[in-house]
Swiss-Prot record:
It is found in: Cell membrane. This is Plasma membrane proteolipid 3. Disulfide bonds: none annotated. GO terms for cellular component: cytoplasm; plasma membrane. Keywords: Cell membrane, Membrane, Transmembrane, Transmembrane helix. InterPro entries: PMP3. It holds the Pfam family Pmp3.
Length: 57
């Protein structure tokens, strides 16, 4: 799937603040909660999860 203009901004948000990138892609749901927990456990797992969600959907 090709990246759109909005996806580029979501990826930038995912690197700076991963839950924000997930929220912009999927809305307020389980994915955001999972990402917040991953960010609390470690910043890198949160980034990986956010990039996965953005690039998958």
């Amino acid at each position: 799937m090709a990246l759109t203009g909005s996806d580029i901004f979501k990826v930038i948000f995912a690197i700076i603040l991963p839950p924000l990138g997930v929220f912009l892609e999927r809305g307020c749901g389980a994915d955001v909660i999972i990402n917040i927990l991953l960010c609390c456990l470690g910043y890198v797992p949160g980034i990986i999860h956010a990039l996965y969600i953005i690039l998958k959907y």
